[in-house]
């Protein structure tokens, strides 16, 4: 199967070779399948990659939070508490760090999967797989992928699999931005 005269499997092999992540997204299963188009292939790669991520555990990081709450949590912002007269209402302005999966790495994946779910080119069975995986991303917010600064993302040995998956996501986002087709 080809996409604008390029065999789809060749695209997969080029990506896998470039990122040396071929084993982590279950190459043998993908090799034997036929894909009608590039988005169907990417949906399968993301489904496999996200399944692998879930087994490893989704990336978590500390995110700074600022809340007005009834009990002290983290650091008290005394100036805001006084200025807003929060103490009269038994409330405190607090700043703290939260260890969460709601970070840019997971937000990119969730938002890209939503793009794939809206594509007519993706087979129903693959959409079903992606929907099941989305249950694990309930705490993760969707973001506008057009605003992502892809080159500023940093990867280490603990989140290296994200680099391969994010390149797939970036390709999907860019192809949708510059697509001349409807949808």
Question: Regions from the language model: what does each represent?
Answer:
Residues 183:
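Catalytic core segments in nucleotide and nucleic-acid processing enzymes
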Residues 1-155, 160-179:
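Terminal, charged accessory segments of proteins
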């Amino acid at each position: 199967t080809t996409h604008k005269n390029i065999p789809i499997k060749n695209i997969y092999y080029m990506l896998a070779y470039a990122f040396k992540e071929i084993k982590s997204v279950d190459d043998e299963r993908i090799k034997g399948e036929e894909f009608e188009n590039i988005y169907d292939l990417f949906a399968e790669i993301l489904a496999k990659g996200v399944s692998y991520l879930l087994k490893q555990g989704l990336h978590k990081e500390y995110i700074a939070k600022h809340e007005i709450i009834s009990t002290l949590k983290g650091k008290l912002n005394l100036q805001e508490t006084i200025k807003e007269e929060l103490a009269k209402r038994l409330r405190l302005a607090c700043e703290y760090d939260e260890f969460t999966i709601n970070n840019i790495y997971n937000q990119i994946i969730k938002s890209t999967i939503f793009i794939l779910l809206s594509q007519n080119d993706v087979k129903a069975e693959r959409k079903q797989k992606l929907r099941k995986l989305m249950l694990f991303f309930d705490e993760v917010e969707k973001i506008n992928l057009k605003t992502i600064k892809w080159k500023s993302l940093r990867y280490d040995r603990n989140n290296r699999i994200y680099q391969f998956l994010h390149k797939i996501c970036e390709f999907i986002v860019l192809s949708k931005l510059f697509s001349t087709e409807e949808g």
